[in-house]
Amino acid sequence: MSRNTPHIFTSESVGEGHPDKVADYISDSILDACLAQDKTSRVACETLVKSNMVIIAGELTTKAVIDPEKIARQAIREIGYCNRQDDDVFHADTVFFTNLLTEQSPDIAQGVDAREAEGKGHAEQGAGDQGIMFGFATNETPELLPAPIVFAHKLLIELARRRKRGHVDWLRPDCKSQVAVAYDEDGRPAHIENVVISTQHTEDVDHDTIYSYCVKLIKNVLPAELLDERTEYFINPTGKFVVGGPHGDSGLTGRKIIVDTYGGMGRHGGGAFSGKDPSKVDRSAAYMCRWVAKHIVAAGLADKCELQVAYAIGYPAPVSIRVDTFGTGKVEEISIENALENIFSFKPADMVEQLNLLRPIYRKTTHYGHFTNPELPWEQLDETRLASLKQLLH
């Protein structure tokens, strides 16, 4: 990942109205509704959207009394698919809704629950599944995230802000962005090679208007020092994008895991986030790994850091932990790994406590990456832990 020669790295983002993100948002909205009433809720909610249909399926164990259909329609309305003229197929008020949620398997529950069970051997909360999770951080941006994914997200955040404020009346919810960043010999962002924006629009706007509007937006949002006459702009390259969202393509929870994380620059264990409560280490451990990697970089122990953990279902402690600083470390990686054991805990119950995860905060994660919102707990640095890590430099 760390390279000594100039190179280009590209990442993409997708907007709130992208069909996969519509599905993610419905799943996270149902999760939050459960946690708002019952913080011990076990939720694994998958959503499929296509044409004028919404189907939810998965496992749900909760004392909360919720109306999944009402929640789904409200989520769709918040995204913006509620215009009678333009949303004649996929509309918040008229979609057909199917609920296939069932209760969590008791075999899975006994492994996760903080109680003894035959063959379990302990009474601690165990991991909800086996698997590997990664966290990543780099000091190339203030967010401690890779520049390409940060830039791609920022473009769509601004596009959505303008759409929702009525800046222009032709913008619609479905959109995508892509940014190619050239890195210099030191591995720092040096130039933006090209930018792609594809945005859904109404029928009554011409391509030239969309092109000039989006190029101006790009120049307002991205760092001016990285843009010049060599930068290429690809705006709605197909020429027309009227049919979008679930009307144009099917959407499914968990299909934008690279957009949700590091834009491809950091590894991904394969487990999606949306619709899963914190007992699922796919979500909680990935957040924890991001939090720890961010502390390692913020403490000055490395310019770039990736953390991997692995779990066995039903067991509380990770079966392995690995730190990789890609040759940018100021101290030995084994020293960092040893220090982590005393500063952080990767047991499922401890991760939930350290990050205060049993709250309805997950709708805030769905859009524009799970690691871009400074209000979220895994994006906030703990000064005591930071100071402990800095001791390794002395």
From Swiss-Prot:
One of its GO terms (biological process) is one-carbon metabolic process. Binds 2 divalent ions per subunit. It comes from Akkermansia muciniphila (strain ATCC BAA-835 / DSM 22959 / JCM 33894 / BCRC 81048 / CCUG 64013 / CIP 107961 / Muc). L-methionine binds at E59, Q104, D249, K280. The gene is metK. ATP binds at H18, D174, C175, K176, K240, F241, D249, R255, K256, A272, K276. K(+) binds at E46. The keyword Zinc does not apply. It is an enzyme of class 2 (transferase). Catalyzes the formation of S-adenosylmethionine (AdoMet) from methionine and ATP. The overall synthetic reaction is composed of two sequential steps, AdoMet formation and the subsequent tripolyphosphate hydrolysis which occurs prior to release of AdoMet from the enzyme. Residues 104-114 are annotated as: Flexible loop. Its EC number is 2.5.1.6. It catalyses: L-methionine + ATP + H2O = S-adenosyl-L-methionine + phosphate + diphosphate. Keywords: ATP-binding, Cytoplasm, Magnesium, Metal-binding, Nucleotide-binding, One-carbon metabolism, Potassium, Transferase. This is S-adenosylmethionine synthase. GO terms for molecular function: ATP binding; magnesium ion binding; methionine adenosyltransferase activity. The lineage of its organism: Bacteria, Pseudomonadati, Verrucomicrobiota, Verrucomicrobiia, Verrucomicrobiales. InterPro entries: ADOMET_SYNTHASE_CS, S-AdoMet_synt_C, S-AdoMet_synt_central, S-AdoMet_synt_N, S-AdoMet_synthetase, S-AdoMet_synthetase_sfam.
